UniProtKB/Swiss-Prot annotation:
Domain of life: Eukaryota
Alphabetized UniProt keyword annotations: Endoplasmic reticulum, Fatty acid biosynthesis, Fatty acid metabolism, Lipid biosynthesis, Lipid metabolism, Membrane, NADP, Oxidoreductase, Transmembrane, Transmembrane helix
Gene Ontology cellular-component terms listed: endoplasmic reticulum; endoplasmic reticulum membrane
Positions of the catalytic residues: Y219 (proton donor), K223 (lowers pka of active site tyr)
Catalytic activity as recorded in UniProt: a very-long-chain (3R)-3-hydroxyacyl-CoA + NADP(+) = a very-long-chain 3-oxoacyl-CoA + NADPH + H(+)
HAMAP family to which the protein is assigned, alphabetical: 3_ketoreductase
Chief location: endoplasmic reticulum
EC number: 1.1.1.330
Cited function: Component of the microsomal membrane bound fatty acid elongation system, which produces the 26-carbon very long-chain fatty acids (VLCFA) from palmitate. Catalyzes the reduction of the 3-ketoacyl-CoA intermediate that is formed in each cycle of fatty acid elongation. VLCFAs serve as precursors for ceramide and sphingolipids.
Name the record gives this protein: Very-long-chain 3-oxoacyl-CoA reductase
Residues at which NADP(+) binds: V71, D125, D133, N152, Y219, K223, I252, S254
Cross-referenced InterPro entries: 3_ketoreductase_fungal (IPR027533), NAD(P)-bd_dom_sf (IPR036291), Sc_DH/Rdtase_CS (IPR020904), SDR_fam (IPR002347)
Length: 345
């Protein structure tokens, strides 16, 4: 009743002299709408917590039997290497695809030494977009029961750089590797999955695809493209029993991120990949994004806050993101100047 009295007083102050019955109806509608809005936010957050901390993901063996294969791109370092090792530990044979043949050979030997699985390797430079490389990849996977595809290959800017100053070769490589390379590889692999009515297509995304990222504009745009493409692909392939998932990730210690120290929000590849593979099919902190997930606990909470509480496309968030990357650029340029000075002495 106190709420109704205050509501009626507000209407009077605004010069809206409604009939008492209409005032009561209006107050009830306003109260109900507010309650439903708050309840929906609370329920969404509970769903996020359950997804991140309680509910298990789909078991990896649901995508293929023992002896089936996983294809991992960008496999020789960082996340790609860790995906390869953990999938081999789970019993999958591994096709390793990356640029450096020597690293692939070393990783293949490590995998076969530690685990009773087979490996195949392909040294392939995705930036070259060479038809012969894709034909060789097709020849390797033809006849294999490929149950899992990990689209991990990717490239970012060397340092945060305004778009107008971005070198053309860097811009071209980012789009060719992140977008075209992922699309061409996926198109080679999924026909077999569609025929077998099972499989997993997992693509590495980024918070850069959620939040417009000034000074990383080309990279951010490439990851936003993958977000839309992967979601569309997920809807197309779901009737075939294929799980498609884009992983939304914040920073991870890696050569690409240039971050070396772990923290609560920056895991190492081993912890991150373990979270990803244990939460397949769970949205984590991305309940508003179909066929997507933020499975690592701190990344999930950050994604929920950014997408459900903040406005990721708003000027405030974009401006803060810009300021952060401007500061990173200044530090990187100062470091480059110091190293240049050391070499000249």
């Amino acid at each position: 009743m106190e709420f109704l009295s205050k509501y009626t007083a507000c209407l009077s102050n605004w010069g809206l002299n409604l009939e008492p019955g209409l005032q009561t109806v209006g107050a009830a509608v306003l109260l109900t709408t507010g309650t439903l809005f708050i309840a929906s936010r609370v329920l969404t957050f509970v769903r996020v917590l359950l997804s991140l901390f309680v509910l298990p993901g789909k078991p990896l063996r649901s995508f293929g039997p023992k002896g089936s294969w996983a294809v991992v791109t960008g496999a020789s370092d960082g996340l790609g290497k860790e995906f390869s090792l953990q999938l081999a530990r789970a019993g999958f044979n591994i096709v390793l695809v990356s640029r450096t043949a020597s690293k692939l050979t070393t990783l293949a030997e490590e995998i076969t030494t530690k685990h009773s699985v087979q490996t195949k390797t392909l040294a392939m430079d995705y930036a070259a977009n060479n038809d012969a490389d894709y034909e060789e990849l097709k020849a390797i996977v033809d006849g294999l029961d490929v149950a899992v595809l990990i689209n991990n290959v990717g490239k970012s800017h060397d340092i945060p750089t305004p778009f107008a100053l971005t070198p053309e070769d860097e811009m071209t490589d980012i789009v060719t590797i992140n977008c075209l390379g992922t699309l061409r590889t996926t198109q080679l692999i999924i026909p077999g999955m569609m025929q077998r009515k099972r499989g997993l297509v997992l693509t590495m995304g980024s918070f850069g695809g959620l939040l417009p990222t000034p000074l990383l504009a080309t990279y951010s745009g490439s990851k936003a493209f993958l977000q839309q493409w992967s979601t569309s692909l997920g809807s197309e392939l779901e009737p075939y029993g294929i799980t498609v998932e884009l992983v939304q990730a914040y920073l991870i210690t890696s050569a690409m991120s240039k971050v070396r120290r772990t923290s609560a929000t920056i895991p190492d590849p081993r912890a991150f990949v373990k979270a990803v593979l244990s939460k397949i099919g769970r949205n984590g902190g991305s309940p508003g994004y179909a066929y997507s997930s933020s499975p690592y606990w701190s990344h999930g909470l950050m994604a929920w806050f950014l997408t459900c509480v903040m406005q990721p496309m708003g000027k405030l968030v974009v401006g803060q993101n810009k300021s952060m990357h401007e500061a990173i650029r200044k530090r990187a340029l100062r470091k480059a100047e110091r190293e240049k000075g050391k070499k000249s002495t």
